[in-house]
A protein has these predicted regions:
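Ferredoxin-reductase
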Residues: 1-77
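Short, Lys/Arg- and Gly-enriched loop/turn segments at beta-strand edges
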Residues: 36-44, 88-95, 230-231
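Short, compositionally biased
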Residues: 42-53, 93-106, 211
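Helix-loop module immediately N-terminal to the HCX5R catalytic loop
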Residues: 79-90, 178-179
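Residues at the starts of beta-strands that form the adenosine-phosphate
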Residues: 80, 99, 125-128, 154-156, ...
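Histidine-anchored nucleotide/phosphate-binding helix
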Residues: 111-120
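Reductase modules of NAD(P)H-dependent flavoproteins
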Residues: 135-236
Length: 236
């Protein structure tokens, strides 16, 4: 399904009698095969409607001449992949903070979709999503997120536009890092999850560290090629 000019989502059915066992926010490793042989990519689960069923939802942004996107964006129904996982630490904290701030750029939103579903049953008092995009055409799952904000008083959506002017109440001019600085963050009561562009994450972590945050309260996941993890693998 096409979400924007450069972004699509995909659904993979699990093998027979297999269901998902993961923490919302984690990712899986996919081994695909094309005419050049097998290759691996890592993708966060984007399941929202059903967290633990028998399918995996992915969001993929097109990369020029990218091997995975060339395969996925041109595939027909029936494409198969070998999948191992889950991996990753970008999950909800065990201790509920006064305020949870989740930050993403572009398709870095993906792992937060299952997290938002889990939050409906988790009792977090305040959750803020900072989502950075260049313009509104990149605001994927916009209707879902706006509907979620209307339904849940604990949730606030802040869309940061770097190449368009804000006009709606939930929109802000500039980058997510600028918006972080506007939040009056508190290292004693706030907990951060950061996902997306590596530079955004490095800059945000630098600011938060200077503001008194420890690494245990700022969980970071950079969207880069072939992410590594030492978690044990399990075939699906």
């Amino acid at each position: 399904r096409t979400l924007s000019e450069s972004t699509k989502d995909f659904r993979f059915a699990c093998a027979a009698n297999t269901s998902l066992d993961y923490k919302p926010g984690q990712f899986y490793r996919f081994v695909f095969a094309d005419e050049r042989g097998e290759f691996e990519r890592s993708y966060s689960l984007c399941n929202f409607d059903e967290l633990y069923g028998q399918h995996i939802d992915l969001v993929v942004s097109q990369v020029d001449n990218g091997r995975a996107t060339n395969l996925l964006f041109n595939c027909k129904e029936g494409l198969e992949a070998k999948v191992t996982g889950p991996f990753g630490r970008l999950t909800l904290p065990e201790e509920i903070p006064t305020r949870l701030i989740i930050v993403a750029t572009s398709v870095g939103l993906a792992p937060y979709m299952p997290i938002l579903k889990e939050l409906e049953m988790s009792g977090f008092p305040e959750v803020v999503l900072l989502l950075g995009v260049r313009d509104r055409t990149e605001f994927i799952y916009g209707n879902v997120l706006k509907g979620y904000a209307e339904k849940h008083d604990y949730f606030e959506l802040q869309l940061c536009l770097s190449r368009e002017k804000s006009s709606e109440g939930y929109e802000y001019d500039g980058y997510v890092n600028t918006q972080i600085e506007r939040l009056d963050v508190n290292p004693d009561s706030d907990h951060f999850l950061l996902c997306g562009n590596p530079k955004m994450i490095d800059d945000a972590w630098g600011y938060l560290k200077e503001s008194g945050f420890k690494s245990k309260n700022v969980v970071r996941e950079k969207y880069v090629f072939a992410r590594e993890s030492r978690s044990s693998a399990k075939a699906l």
